[in-house]
Amino acid sequence: MMNTSNGMISGPSSSSSPAANPQSPGIKTYFKTPEGKYKLHYEKTHSSVKSIHFSNSNPMCHAFDPDAKDGHDLLIGLNSGDVYTVSLRQQLQDVSKKLVGALHYNKDGSVNNSRCTSISWVPGGDGAFVVAHADGNLYVYEKNKDGATDSTFPAIRDPTQFSVDKAKYSKSNPVARWHICQGAINSIAFSNDGAHLATVGRDGYLRIFDFLTQKLVCGGKSYYGALLCCSWSMDGKYILTGGEDDLVQVWSMEDRKVVAWGEGHNSWVSGVAFDSYWSSPNSDGSGEHVMYRFGSVGQDTQLLLWDLEMDEIVVPLRRPPGGSPTYSTGSQSAHWDNVIPVGTLQPAPCKRDVPKLSPIIAHRVHTEPLSGLMFTQESVVTACREGHIKIWTRPSDSETQSNSCPEANPTSALLSTSSPKDNKTSLSSKVISGSSFKQ
């Protein structure tokens, strides 16, 4: 599911032509990658299947758990701070425009009346979920506990410091409050195993926590302004962030620092995601990832796709007296002079000390600023601020195999022979750019 603002979703396309959509000047019905064409599958708007109205507040965020045991698989966070869990199937079966069979938490903002900014189920958490708020606090709930019970927390001792407090009573829900920062928490994301929680906020910091021990592991600051979004790789080794500096940053959990940054957007980056369904054309035989594919969307209306190659992440280690600097590749542990201690929040590193990424494609996919990005096995899904969703189908297997053959694709062969050592601070990727503009 993706956020929409006006109940409209994209519908079936009436044309398979690569010509531009006449209703969206400058936007084509496909974009190309080294694997082949991603074709626009849905481009018209249709009425929503179900519309739910909230009388006193607006929904701000939601999360879906397909593995929920009791049927309550959908979380909804409101502008008032209220939180609901409901059964998606039950909502679709009911003809009314009201929630049915909902469990209600933080009713009327009784625990926290600032708006919900991000919400997530805890992977493997047996119904546990977390809710982030605009005042910099995050609350941990247990779905099976009564949401109407009183939860009282002590006063925050130092608003500038991270702190965790448990509820005063064992039957309370929420069960814990995490004070993350003084400004709003803009987005949260769990690693796939649920071991780590990443948050990004208005203060421009990424923070990564060990969720079980409730300790800060690492984090750092953007180059400018707030961070707006974050996402984990499936193996939990890397975290993406994007924000008001128009950049995408790649963080390494092993090194606890930024290992690459990407430049290509012309405005704020509003969504980032790894493509866990994409298969790297190369393999080192160890079962380890040698290349990651990820995407980003921004308020410049563009979708950018990126390739992160482990052998091309080259970072300076140290400069011997009177000699040239030594380097370490991303296939090993890319340590600099000093190992970053656990629990350290770092300033933004000097850009020339971190490898720079360029997108493999940049494509204008909507006429309005983009708000969301999601990868599925069959497609790439994009959503814009006006509530329109587009689904781009992946290249067919035969097309992918044809383009991966050097004899059939001279351009691919040329790119595959380029050496990553030609430029030690920049990753070799070609930009295939569509039209773009800054909002």
Please state what every model-predicted region is.
Residues 46, 86-102, 135-175, 182, ...:
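Per-blade loop-tip surfaces of WD-repeat and WD-like beta-propellers in eukaryotic adaptors/scaffolds
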Residues 70-75, 125-130, 194-198, 216-218, ...:
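Structural hallmark of WD40 beta-propellers
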Residues 37, 43-54, 75-103:
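Beta-propeller domains
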